């Protein structure tokens, strides 16, 4: 089960990275892409699980 979580985590990171590159510079903190924010929220929930 843990392996699935790790795989999912890595996939999400890859998706977020590609979305950031498509949107332009990752330094734009004033505007957050909703899809990107959703990805970060999911990652946070995964991190909080023991």
UniProtKB/Swiss-Prot annotation:
<keyword id="KW-0964">Secreted</keyword>
<comment type="subunit">
    <text>Monomer.</text>
</comment>
<protein>
    <recommendedName>
        <fullName>Ampulexin 1</fullName>
    </recommendedName>
</protein>
<feature type="signal peptide">
    <location>
        <begin position="1"/>
        <end position="26"/>
    </location>
</feature>
<keyword id="KW-0732">Signal</keyword>
<dbReference type="GO" id="GO:0005576">
    <property type="term" value="C:extracellular region"/>
</dbReference>
<comment type="function">
    <text>Amphipathic peptide which probably adopts an alpha-helical structure. When injected in subesophageal ganglia of cockroach P.americana, a natural host for larvae of A.compressa, dampens the escape response for about 1 hour which may contribute to early stages of hypokinesia. Has no antimicrobial activity against E.coli DH5alpha or B.thuringiensis. Is not cytotoxic in vitro.</text>
</comment>
